[in-house]
Structure formats: C-alpha cells, structure tokens
C-alpha cells in the first residue's frame, strides 16, 4: 500500500500541505518528513496542516482516497465510511475553503465503499461516477445537482466497471499543457465504446497494466498519484 501516497498527503494551490490520519496502523509509517522536505526544496509550502493526531481518537480521513476534490470549484466529494470521518471532512473543508458533498455509497453486495476515488473521478469538464452505489435518492440527487451546477458532464459507470477500477482515474496535465486521463488497462478495457469516445472528446486516455497492484493492493492508477498543485520555486 505504500505505493498509494494520495492517502496520506495532499498539496494545494495556496501552499498548504495536508497530512492525513490513516486507518491501517502499518500504513502510518508512510508519512515521511523526508518526502515533505523534498517537496519544500522544489515548491513553495506556506503551511503544513497535520490531521494525523486524529488517529488517537480512531477517526480517519485518508486524503484524496477519502475525498475526490473539484479543485476549480472547491468542492470535496466524499462517501462517509470508517476511513472517511464526516467531522474531519468538515474540518478539512473549513481550512481549505471547500464545500463538502457527502453521501453513503455501497457496492453491489451492500458493503460500504470506503474510498470515494473508487466510485468517482472529477475532471475539468466531466465526472465519471457509479451512481448506482448511492442508495439514498436525496444524496444521489444532491451529488448529481452539484456536478451539473459546476458544469460537469456525468459519465455513469456500472458496479461491474467499478470493480474493475473504472472509477479510479485521474486527469493530469503535461508540461505542454495537454490534458490526459490516466487509468489502468483493466479499467480501460471495462469501458464501452460510447464511454471511451465520450472521454476522448475531452482528453486522450493513457492506460497501463496494473493488475498485480490492483489485486494485491486494492487500488489502481489514481491511488498511485499525489498531484502537486504548489507553486514552483524560482530560485
């Protein structure tokens, strides 16, 4: 799981770096100051917000696994679970200037989905989401309304596609300012032709086989990236 840095750290445009409380005790050692020091050498960090003390209360918020962030519109989407505490979610939103849109999501066997980034992805002009996982109609409609109001085209995925990590994608930007959508080959292969064509209207798709990681670690492409939005140092 140490190849999933997005669960313990996130970087923000205003210079904030957040450190997060982790559910699994063996993963708490991943929060390394050496990583933060490397980032500080290359980027401007104004403040470090350390939420990890919440582990003493046995409450958790596992970074951008727990929260899918619409950074442009400052919205934090989160499915509440033992790894995603609503109080900590609201604390994050108050500090970072986000609005929380929270809900409960379950898989097809009615088991809680503990990481939001498994069932949805928010990009610049679209969102990939498994709406079937949200049982409560009010919560589902609130999510749909929020996405539509922020100008996102909703691309719906099924439970079967969710199981193949089709929700675990991340839109990134190259040094040439080209937008790309990154996912695993398993996720890509699960998409139907219409879904692929719709996504490719917005950006190219990049995929790579991650089967061993997906099988052993339970995460996929998005989990392996902790995107840096900090301003680069000029010196």
What is the predicted role of each segment?
Residues 1-235:
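The feature marks the mature, well-folded catalytic cores of soluble enzymes
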């Amino acid at each position: 799981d140490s190849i999933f840095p997005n669960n313990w750290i996130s970087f923000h445009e205003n210079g904030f770096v957040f450190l997060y409380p982790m559910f699994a005790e063996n993963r708490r050692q991943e929060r390394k100051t050496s990583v933060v020091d490397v980032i500080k050498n290359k980027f401007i960090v104004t403040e470090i917000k350390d939420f990890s003390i919440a582990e003493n209360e046995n409450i958790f918020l596992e970074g951008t696994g727990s929260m899918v962030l619409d950074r442009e519109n400052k919205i934090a989407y989160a499915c509440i679970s033992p790894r995603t505490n609503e109080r900590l979610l609201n604390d994050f939103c108050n500090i970072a200037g986000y609005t929380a849109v929270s809900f409960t999501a379950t898989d097809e066997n009615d088991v809680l989905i503990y990481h939001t980034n498994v069932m949805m992805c928010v990009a610049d002009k679209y969102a990939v989401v498994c709406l079937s996982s949200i049982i409560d109609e009010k919560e589902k409609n609130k999510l749909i309304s929020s996405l539509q109001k922020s100008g996102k085209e909703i691309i719906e995925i099924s439970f079967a596609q969710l199981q193949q990590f089709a929700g675990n994608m991340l839109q990134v930007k190259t040094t040439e300012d080209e937008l790309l959508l990154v996912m695993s080959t398993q996720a890509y292969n699960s998409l139907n032709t219409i879904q692929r064509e719709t996504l490719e209207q917005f950006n190219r798709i990049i995929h790579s086989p991650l089967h061993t990681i997906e099988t052993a670690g339970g995460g996929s492409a998005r989990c392996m990236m902790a995107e840096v939005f900090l301003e680069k140092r000029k010196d």
